[in-house]
From Swiss-Prot:
The keyword Amino-acid biosynthesis applies. The keyword Transmembrane does not apply. GO terms for biological process: arginine biosynthetic process via ornithine; citrulline biosynthetic process; L-arginine biosynthetic process. This is Ornithine carbamoyltransferase. Reversibly catalyzes the transfer of the carbamoyl group from carbamoyl phosphate (CP) to the N(epsilon) atom of ornithine (ORN) to produce L-citrulline. L-ornithine binds at residues 172, 236, 240-241. Keywords: Amino-acid biosynthesis, Arginine biosynthesis, Cytoplasm, Transferase. It comes from Halalkalibacterium halodurans (strain ATCC BAA-125 / DSM 18197 / FERM 7344 / JCM 9153 / C-125). One of its GO terms (cellular component) is cytoplasm. Its EC number is 2.1.3.3.
């Protein structure tokens, strides 16, 4: 079997619930492996590192990028991915998470889960005897943040000292961007309306982690302050899944936080625009920005594949 990096920190058997659980060295290793796997894919090199391995994918929420990228990633690595929706599982009929975790652990080599409740993922990981990967909860979206950091790294050549501005709702994506900024030395400024701030416990945990890398994490209600001299500007939908009923109310509150051409003029000339998708053109971002020359959204979406392949290989074979 071809090997990845020769000198690696073994992550075999670990869970990925939040990047705050990983050291800066471990996060950097995942990014390095993602770059290597991306290059191998570009070169047409086979990467059968997970031959004979199976990934159980539990989806309680709809998904395009997450399902396709994990499924294709496992296939490219020589393994198999099994899609499981609530209607396919007894957990959807009230079976305890403990039983589901223990039983699935007897069948598959890792479990990926996308659900609203972070507590449910923590419970699943507690009882599972195989690695559990958080593919989105109400608190974190670590695989997305790895892809985001990978994209910025490719565009800017380093993350250390670069400024990422996140503008919009202080949601799960925002939490994970704070986490990866803290772990990589990337400065992150978050601009949110009052009442829609990031979870302060998560912010404090990320701030504590940032002391190790020198990253600066800032909260503000002013999107112009966030955008000033930014290397990358990031936004997300104003109403995440589960908050659709608040759409009209949020549109009024978030309108001053729209990412548009005027806001981009405050950033560096080579600023990259990021969005985890799906996007609502004309709401959180204008079409001229998301479809313009600064947009890196499709590179970012592709990098979900490579980042997750790095996670899978690291957790399943330790390389």
């Amino acid at each position: 079997m071809n090997h990845l990096s020769e000198k690696v920190i073994s992550l075999k058997g670990r869970d990925l619930l939040t990047l705050l659980d990983y050291t800066p060295e471990e996060v950097q290793q995942l990014l390095t492996q993602a770059l290597e796997l991306k290059q191998k894919a570009k070169n047409g090199e086979p990467t059968p590192y997970l031959t004979g391995k199976s990934l159980g994918m539990i989806f309680e929420n709809a998904s395009t990028r997450t399902r396709v990228s994990f499924e294709v990633g496992m296939t490219q690595l020589g393994g198999h991915a099994l899609f499981l929706s609530p209607k396919d599982l007894q957990i959807g009929r009230g079976e305890p998470i403990k039983d589901t975790a223990n039983v699935l652990s007897r069948y598959v080599d890792a479990i990926m889960i996308r659900t609203n409740s972070h507590e449910s993922v923590e419970e699943l990981a507690h009882y599972a005897t195989v690695p559990v990967i958080n593919a989105l909860t109400d608190a974190y979206h670590p695989c997305q943040a790895l892809a985001d950091a990978l994209t910025i790294l490719e565009k800017k050549e380093t993350l250390i000292g670069k400024k990422l501005a996140y503008i919009g709702d202080g949601n799960n994506v925002c939490h994970s961007l704070l986490a990866i900024g803290a772990k990589t030395g990337m400065d992150v400024t978050v601009a949110t309306p009052k009442g829609y701030e990031v979870d302060q416990e998560i912010f404090q945990r990320a701030t504590e982690a940032a002391k190790e890398t020198g990253a600066t994490l800032v909260q503000t209600t002013n999107p112009q302050v966030a955008a000033e001299n930014a290397d990358a500007i990031y936004t997300d939908v104003w109403a995440s899944m589960g908050y659709e009923a608040e759409q009209s109310e949020r549109e009024e509150v978030f309108q001053p936080y729209q990412v548009n051409d005027q806001l981009l003029t405050l950033a560096k000339k080579d600023v990259s625009f990021l969005h985890c998708l799906p996007a609502h053109r004309g709401e959180e971002v204008t079409a001229s920005v998301i479809d313009g020359p600064h947009s890196a959204i499709y590179d970012q979406a592709e990098n979900r594949l490579h980042a997750q392949k790095a996670v899978l290989t690291a957790l399943l074979i330790g390389e």
